[in-house]
Amino acid sequence: MEQSEGVNWTVIILTCQYKDSVQVFQRELEVRQRREQIPAGTMLLAVEDPQTRVGSGGATLNALLVAAEHLSARAGFTVVTSDVLHSAWILILHMGRDFPFDDCGRAFTCLPVENPQAPVEALVCNLDCLLDIMTHRLGPGSPPGVWVCSTDMLLSVPPNPGISWDGFRGARVIAFPGSLAYALNHGVYLTDSQGLVLDIYYQGTKAEIQRCVGPDGLVPLVSGVVFFSVETAEHLLATHVSPPLDACTYMGLDSGAQPVQLSLFFDILLCMARNMSRENFLAGRPPELGQGDMDVASYLKGARAQLWRELRDQPLTMVYVPDGGYSYMTTDATEFLHRLTMPGVAVAQIVHSQVEEPQLLEATCSVVSCLLEGPVHLGPRSVLQHCHLRGPIRIGAGCFVSGLDTAHSEALHGLELHDVILQGHHVRLHGSLSRVFTLAGRLDSWERQGAGMYLNMSWNEFFKKTGIRDWDLWDPDTPPSDRCLLTARLFPVLHPTRALGPQDVLWMLHPRKHRGEALRAWRASWRLSWEQLQPCVDRAATLDFRRDLFFCQALQKARHVLEARQDLCLRPLIRAAVGEGCSGPLLATLDKVAAGAEDPGVAARALACVADVLGCMAEGRGGLRSGPAANPEWIQPFSYLECGDLMRGVEALAQEREKWLTRPALLVRAARHYEGAEQILIRQAVMTARHFVSTQPVELPAPGQWVVTECPARVDFSGGWSDTPPIAYELGGAVLGLAVRVDGRRPIGAKARRIPEPELWLAVGPRQDEMTMRIVCRSLDDLRDYCQPHAPGALLKAAFICAGIVHLHSELPLLEQLLHSFNGGFELHTWSELPHGSGLGTSSILAGAALAALQRAAGRAVGTEALIHAVLHLEQVLTTGGGWQDQVSGLMPGIKVGRSRAQLPLKVEVEEITVPEGFVQKINDHLLLVYTGKTRLARNLLQDVLRNWYARLPVVVQNARRLVRQTEKCAEAFRQGNLPLLGQYLTSYWEQKKLMAPGCEPLAVQRMMDVLAPYAYGQSLAGAGGGGFLYLLTKEPRQKETLEAVLAKAEGLGNYSVHLVEVDPQGLSLQLLGHDTRLCGAGPSEVGTT
């Protein structure tokens, strides 16, 4: 359904014929407002008709009065004033009469339609489709006024029907194309060439209908949709104070006026038709009124005379929607089933349902909001709605079954239904709620004047087959004309000794099987006719049953989606559950999935969904979702997860969660801790990369001998974010990156050596002495903040732990560990010449450099591919998370593609890309770096990306797949040496990054890219974006000075700088140097301690 900007309704009114349904339907409107189907500021009113047979015209006048009264009160008036209509867009929806196939009427008849774009998952009723059509298709562009829409028809309207409102006044009807044959049983408009309505025919003659045929050979059908301008609505409203039209409103009823039945089309609108004379109008009567006594005719004549006075001068025009469709929802079961099983683009066979054996459903059947357990066979052209059935069950062709649950399944075992309508109803009899079951045939007529049939046979055949007699069904004084399905007391509602079930009507299909027992039980029951049953239907209980069943299947869906690792977004379901009070069962389901998961990825996603539920419960209040997650109250659940005890961990999380549900701020903080728990499971999954970390023993360097590693930076050309856990092992990742020197230098490095003191000396800072941070660790306690990324020297401390030099949980103190294994301690210094948050992969490459230097200083050689996996492990120990692309691109030389498969253990495989001769130099001539002067840590963006990935937002899932696909195309462009094509991929890569992490493009950066665009084949921010370095492929070679001049002329770009960049053919380099007793220019006595 279309979800573009639509009408911002001032008031929406839903009229209904039963006063005990008003609150029920008011709640349904409010639910739709919470689902964002209705604007938040719209006034919602469910209004009962003054009388059950007030007619569509009377219901419209009454609704208009109620709307004006509420708007007048809101505006501060003490009397009803029509002035409030001048700035109001009002929508009146008419529920209409009872419908034999749905206890809540045609408006709430569920359709086999899903709306994947809806922010909240929900069944789609006819009301929802009509609301969408009125709000987003027919309504936009209309001036203030009153739209009236029946709900007794199915409509289809193109996204932009092209309705012009220029110079409009009066009233306007919307018409849809229909065949001449269809029009014989419906209403049609006769118009002139200007679109003015000349006449309205209902079930007209062939000659009348022929006059209405348009150039397309079709006729304009009366659709039930009307618009009244403010002027016309004021004239209509003015009639409510004068007899006899005052009787159409609740005010008239409260004043004791005699009820009058009025038709919207054949009373109110017909008097505006140009060909209608006053005499003919006053003498006529609407088709729904039928033939009555003279008093009624006289009363109606007075009402029509008043309408003529008020409305005759108002023009009535028609808009014809040639590409639209209209279908009245008749009481013909065959036609009803055809509408619900007709294949079409938007129609799914299984809608909001969980079916264990879908292969048993035949092609043209429809299942809506059902749970089908075991073998349930459904034949062609059959429909199941709102049922929870347990097989074995066989339902053949041409059936409609609704409102049954598992308790009623047994009644269907051993039967095969064909061409029947079986429904379960919630009725309230003398204040008690009970279930009643009705049975009818597909060919039966629900009209009073219809053919005398029941269960697809004549009454005489039915009496003969079942033993039932006519006096069982009708009183002796009931005239033959009134003896029909509607009045027959067929349906048991109370048995003196037992509860009733579907078997109390199903026996009529095979009476001989029951040897008279069923007939005796049937006769012993209190029975009602269909007409008698309708006022007893409890619509609140009906809708509650449907809602409970919907969420029952939705919880099963959630469980299946998670356990089967499906890429379906659960956020709409979460919003639905929270919005309609089902958050508790959903949380319990997610707990079960997480606790029972064999795969840490499934458990982590389930915990992420719990965080989403808690965030949704906070309703946008309580602060940002991202934030700290180390409150002491959550330590115990986290410790269980860290130890691998998933079941106890999930249980402890749920127990703690109960204490945090009372207000939005606590809910948000609880959500953050669930994301913290999810991160523990991600860490455990990524830790599997340790399988691919191995070292070889080599000669131990002499004490004091430096091991120095140097590394280039990296530039990512395609596929970034796909390397990020859990995407890297759930979808699989592929990233193309370049190892690069910046301004001719390899900006990242580390050096390590053994020292005689059994201590760890750490230094972080530039390669030279100034601004160096120095730390000495003399005990294990000095290392315990290794997992706090912002703690001084945390990365270096984590490197010692991951390299296996220090064992934090050993009983031996640090001094003894170092002396026992190495006869002394270590000194480690790391440096980067790049600014913090550069986007060039600094921290991961630095971790690789530090690990390589440390391992070699400890007498171990580690290969580059092992080092790539070791950095993954280190970053999980450090708790920064992150993917593998930085170390792949910075530790390995040149141009390469790294790949990981959708599996655990997490393994990264690297392919070096061979390019044409001379193309590397061409890249060097055309590739430039621009420092934007802005920094943003990738972690700030990472939490949002992970949250959206675990939610499986369609845009994120699709984009992640595109990232991986484009990496392979980009690699091919490098192999071909196609610079312009690489520029195109670079530009689309930047668009993909922005889709993945909205907010990664600061305004100043956007301005800078706009300035540079004419000079570049393509450009992107490095890494996750948000700031740092921008890189671009220039159209001309060696453009550093040119771009500096261009940027200098632009205003407001801040502290930028342009840098040369070249592909590094070496990658990580390691060398052993001579002795040096100095630690970055400071002796041990000058070094601080932690």
Curated annotation (Swiss-Prot):
It comes from Mus musculus (Mouse). ATP binds at L834, P835, H836, G837, S838, G839, L840, G841, T842, S843, S844, I845. Isoform 1: Expressed strongly in brain, ovary and testis, moderately in kidney and liver, and weakly in lung, spleen and heart. Isoform 2: Expressed very strongly in brain, strongly in ovary, testis and kidney, moderately in lung and liver, and weakly in heart and spleen. It catalyses: L-fucose + ATP = beta-L-fucose 1-phosphate + ADP + H(+). It is an enzyme of class 2 (transferase). This is L-fucose kinase. InterPro entries: GDP_fucose_pyrophosphorylase (IPR012887), GHMP_Kinase-Related (IPR052203), GHMP_kinase_C_dom (IPR013750), GHMP_kinase_C_sf (IPR036554), GHMP_kinase_N_dom (IPR006204), Ribosomal_Su5_D2-typ_SF (IPR020568). Belongs to the GHMP kinase family. GO terms for biological process: carbohydrate phosphorylation; GDP-L-fucose salvage. Takes part in the salvage pathway for reutilization of fucose from the degradation of oligosaccharides. PANTHER family: L-FUCOSE KINASE. One of its GO terms (molecular function) is fucokinase activity. SUPFAM superfamilies: GHMP Kinase, C-terminal domain, Ribosomal protein S5 domain 2-like.
